[in-house]
Every structure is written in C-alpha cells, then in structure tokens.
Amino acid sequence: MPEATAGPLSAEQGASLYRLMTWLSPAFPVGAFSYSSGLEWAVEAGDVADAASLRDWLGAMLEHGAGFCDGVFLAQAYRAVEAGDDAALRDVAELAAAMVPSAERHLETTAQGKAFIEIVRHAWASDGLARAVGACNGALAYPVAVGLVSATHRVPLAATLHAFLHAVVSNWISAGARLVPLGQTDSQRLLAALEPAVIATGDRALRASLDDLGGATFRADLASLRHETQYTRLFRS
C-alpha cells in the first residue's frame, strides 16, 4: 500500500483495502474461531498460563513456525498466479498442504482454504480464479488460497501478506483469550506487542523462497499432535 498522504485513495487502492479488510476480517466465514493451532493443549499442559507466556508462545509460532511458513506459501502462490505458472502454483499448493505437523492442523488450513475459495467464488469472482484453483489440483491450504485470490484481484502482495499475518495472530490471540483466559485489554496489549514481529515476519516472508521454509517450534507442533487426544476440548485443533 502507498505511504500515508492527506489525499484520497485511488479507486484501485480503495478497492484493494476494502477487499483485504473484508476477506481477512473475523466476520469472514472461514471458521477460524474454531481452531487454536494446538494452543488449547499448550494451556492444558501449563506451557501457556498468562499474557506473558502467551506472547512468547505466539511470537515463536509467528517468527519461527507456522506464521513465517504460511507467509512464504502465500507470497509464492501469489507470484505463481501473477506469472501464469500453473506448475509452480501446483507445487506450492502441494507443499503447503503437506507441510503441517498433525492431522488437525491439516484440517485447519485446508478447511479454511476451501471455505475462503468458495465464498470468494460466489461473492468476489475474478478473472483467472477458476483457472488458478484448478491448477492446484487438490486441497488448498489457507495461505495459498489467500495468495491466489489476491493475485487474481491484483491486490498488492505486501499488503496482503501483512494483513494475512495480522489476521492469523489475531485469531491466535482470540483463542488464547478464551483459554487462559485474558480480558479484552490484555488481548489488545498483546496484539500491539506483536506488531513489530508481524511486520518483520511479513518482510522476511516476502523476500524468502521455498528453500527458506522451515521451523523450530517443536513444542507447538507436539501440542497440535497431543490435542488430537485431549479429553475436553473447545477447539478443533
């Protein structure tokens, strides 16, 4: 998005901002509220017990785990669509669907990806969307779905990437607020505290290639596996 000015947005800038705010709003019905990315087990196990430990947990997931990897998948899917490279898009889609640590995390990303595409297909159709989805030839991970939709709508990549990561972190915080629990003010303090990490992770993902993918959030990955057999659960992951 352009630097701040006193003048109005252009029609294209206004449309891009409007669509990002809509697609990545908590009100957009992809079912994000029902997933915790393993956080529910982390609270059960005592790894996350208050605002400070939640901040550390989410910061690690963002910078060294699913947040960064999903950002790379989004950017690579966007660029493949922009270049008209169906083979590259298919490779990104397959890798994104495979590179998850548990069955529940696979459900989380592919169910949201499917819902996102279906809603956009009916309400925000664009030239090239059907071809891009068809090229993927299988389940679509959520970041890949967001990347290819934004590319077909010509929404700027950097803005899409930062908005996506903000939405992901916001959903994690929402889950944490219900589980720890946290109040509304603490939740907003946490979101504000993670702003630099969201920006830095978005910038890093924008410059990264698929060769840079990887993570070091083993406890978060194990939490997503342990959640599958957790006795009492609020969330699907």
Swiss-Prot record:
Keywords from the UniProt entry: Chaperone, Cytoplasm, Nickel insertion
GO molecular function, one term: nickel cation binding
GO terms under cellular component: cytoplasm
InterPro entries for the chain: UreF (IPR002639), UreF_sf (IPR038277)
Pfam families to which the protein is assigned, alphabetical: UreF
Domain of life: Bacteria
Location of this chain's protein in the cell: Cytoplasm
Major localization listed first in the record, in broad terms: cytoplasm
Primary role: Required for maturation of urease via the functional incorporation of the urease nickel metallocenter.
Subunit note: UreD, UreF and UreG form a complex that acts as a GTP-hydrolysis-dependent molecular chaperone, activating the urease apoprotein by helping to assemble the nickel containing metallocenter of UreC. The UreE protein probably delivers the nickel.
Similarity annotation: Belongs to the UreF family.
Name assigned to this protein: Urease accessory protein UreF
Originating organism: Rhodopseudomonas palustris (strain HaA2)
Lineage, opening ranks: Bacteria, Pseudomonadati, Pseudomonadota, Alphaproteobacteria, Hyphomicrobiales
Underlying gene: ureF
